[in-house]
A protein has these predicted regions:
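Membrane-proximal intracellular helices of multi-pass ion channels
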Residues: 1-370
Length: 370
């Protein structure tokens, strides 16, 4: 095991995190909030990151180093990412801060907080920005910004990415990372502007776009998206939750003009079919609960998109929905988004693959029985 190279890569990733902490620091300064929690966090994270990145090492890097680096980096990223929460004084203990940080970077969206609106804007910004960093993968961001492992970066990408198959979009892995994050940034900015046009303030548009892009679900409001009471905002976020649930390699194909090849994706067709069919079933099931103005369809589509993408936003209290709709949402939670997206769960591609393998297995067993 090449520990020196792993520690060096860890140090560079912590330097990226220290740089990312500058953004919420600017938010604090803009809104005239106390910047000390972020100043201390930047100093501590940067110092440890610099010390580790200066370690001398050889270039021997194999898959086992990739998996170990991913595990160590996610642990340390979460530990240092919790520092602003701890120094802010709004969390009772560092354990709670660490929980919030892990939830942010892993885009889980669970929180120890019962009310988020009293928190400073800088802290709320950092909570959602952790979603954005963790959604595509912190290490993929590091590779894009600081390519230093040459062709061996593919080991890191494979260890970092949760989908069944990880391949390079172009021959150079670092270039693939830049393409992925370029698409990621472009889609995020597009959502920011769409939400702003729909009437959401700039700050809220940024925070909710980060959470949508990372499919995490942290919000600036206690009632999540339901607090805005805006059909336009709900429709926009519904669309972007689905957009970020699709394999980013397909967007690359679209950019290359290979539209037919992108649309021939079996996983994409299965994903869209599941979304459409689930929305239809839930809409019919909850139709009597809402006015006859299409609200049932809007809320059904929003919650289907929120659950299957594992984002976790809410436009209404779906605990009040009939049991059939709630069970269907739970099933969607297990299916999840497409491979190569920022969404979670077992990935949509595995469902038809498992089904085909099961059919083949049963067919072979029946032949053996005959």
């Amino acid at each position: 095991m090449n520990f020196r190279l792993v520690f060096k890569l860890t140090g560079k990733t912590l330097l990226v995190e220290a740089g990312a902490l500058l953004l919420p620091l600017l938010v604090c300064l803009f809104y005239r909030e106390n910047p000390l929690p972020f100043l201390l966090s930047i100093a501590m994270t940067g110092a440890v990151g610099l010390a580790l990145s200066l370690i001398r090492s050889n270039d021997h890097f194999f898959p086992r180093e990739g998996f170990f680096a991913v595990a160590l980096i996610w642990l340390l990223m979460s530990a240092f990412g919790a520092l602003p929460f701890f120094f802010s004084g709004f969390f009772p203990s560092y354990v709670d801060c660490f929980f919030e940080s892990v939830s942010g970077f892993t885009t889980t969206g669970a929180s120890v907080l019962t009310a988020v609106e009293p928190l400073p804007r800088g802290i709320l910004f950092w909570r959602s920005f952790m979603h954005w960093m963790g959604g595509m993968g912190v290490l993929i961001l590091t590779i894009a910004l600081l390519p230093s492992l040459g062709g061996r970066t593919l080991h890191v990408m494979r260890a970092e990415s949760p989908g069944p198959i990880v391949s390079k979009l172009v021959p150079k892995t670092s270039q693939s990372s830049k393409i992925l994050y370029g698409i990621y940034c472009a889609l995020t900015l597009l959502e920011v502007f769409c939400l702003r046009i729909a009437g959401m303030p700039w700050y809220d548009s940024l925070v909710h776009s980060f959470a949508t892009a990372g499919t995490g679900g942290f919000s600036t409001r206690n009632l999540s998206i339901a607090a805005y009471e805006s059909p336009a905002i709900e429709v926009i976020i519904t669309l972007f939750m689905l957009v970020f649930s699709i394999n980013f390699a397909l967007y690359f194909l679209l950019l290359c003009g290979k539209v037919r090849q992108a649309l021939r994706s079996d996983e994409l067709r299965f994903f869209l079919a599941v979304v459409a069919f689930s929305t239809l079933l839930i809409s019919i099931n909850i139709w009597p609960m809402y006015p006859a103005d299409g609200s049932a369809v809007r809320h059904a589509a929003f919650q289907v998109g929120s659950i299957i993408s594992t984002t976790g936003f809410a436009s209404t209290d779906f605990n009040l929905w009939p049991e059939f709709s709630r069970i269907l949402l739970v099933l969607l939670m297990f299916i999840g988004a497409c491979a190569g997206s920022t969404g979670g769960a077992i990935k949509c591609s595995r469902v038809p693959q498992s089904g085909r393998r099961l059919v083949v297995h049963l067919r072979d067993d029946s032949r053996d029985g005959v």
